[in-house]
Amino acid sequence: MSAEKSMNVSREFSVQQIHSFTLSEKTARYLAIKRVMDIWFALIGLAIALPMIAVFSILICLETPGPAIYTQERVGKGGKPFKLYKLRSMKIDAEKSGAVWAQKQDPRVTRIGAFIRRTRIDELPQLFNVLKGDMSMIGPRPERPVFTEKFQNEIPGFTQRLGSGERRLRYDAEGKADI
């Protein structure tokens, strides 16, 4: 009998209908709870991470001249740009020729930088971005404007994953957009 029910259900709904949703289905309560949790986890994370951020900031400044905290423009929710914070893992002039992704054994990456990238310690200052509301603990990774523009031309639905208001995006398309 359960096989008959599943057959009926599969005839009544298309896969696209089952795997799609609209942002308006998320309630204000859900978004408020998510924001409170972001603030809570960011505060706890910063309490734990600040000593590490301080130590690695000193090590970065001792190894190479320049600021320890690196800021980079990213595209956030609704396509709004913001400054993302990271511990600097590359030499100061690393992107003088333009925006490129780091490669394996990239000569622009410092010795301390290689370690903090491998251990993801370079990402700890992003807890300040979460606290400010620029980004969330859970959600799509904010990308650089140059790459966002490139991906929106190559990957259908890429910018919709940023939650720019009312939208419809299938789960499988959202997964591809995050890749």
From Swiss-Prot:
Coiled coil region boundaries: none
Single GO cellular component term: plasma membrane
GO biological process: cell wall organization; teichuronic acid biosynthetic process
Superkingdom, taxonomy of origin: Bacteria
Record-listed E.C. numbers: 2.7.8.40
Similarity comment: Belongs to the bacterial sugar transferase family.
More details: The nature of the anionic polymer present in the cell wall of B.subtilis depends on phosphate availability. Under phosphate-replete growth conditions teichoic acids are present, whereas under phosphate-depleted conditions, at least part of the wall teichoic acid is replaced with teichuronic acid, a non-phosphate containing anionic polymer. The synthesis of teichuronic acid is accompanied by degradation of teichoic acid and reutilization of liberated phosphate for other cellular processes such as nucleic acid synthesis.
Function: Might mediate the very first reaction in teichuronic synthesis, i.e. the formation of lipid-linked N-acetylglucosamine.
Induction of expression: By phosphate starvation, via the PhoP/PhoR two-component regulatory system.
Biological or metabolic pathway of the protein: Cell wall biogenesis; teichuronic acid biosynthesis
UniProt keyword terms in alphabetical order: Cell membrane, Cell wall biogenesis/degradation, Glycosyltransferase, Membrane, Stress response, Transferase, Transmembrane, Transmembrane helix
Pfam families for this protein: Bac_transf
Compartment list: Cell membrane
Protein's name according to its UniProt entry: Putative undecaprenyl-phosphate N-acetylgalactosaminyl 1-phosphate transferase
Membrane topology category: Single-pass membrane protein
Catalytic activity: di-trans,octa-cis-undecaprenyl phosphate + UDP-N-acetyl-alpha-D-galactosamine = N-acetyl-alpha-D-galactosaminyl-di-trans,octa-cis-undecaprenyl diphosphate + UMP
Main enzyme class: transferase
GO MF annotations, alphabetized: glycosyltransferase activity; phosphotransferase activity, for other substituted phosphate groups
Transmembrane segments: 39-59
InterPro entries membership: Bact_transf (IPR003362)
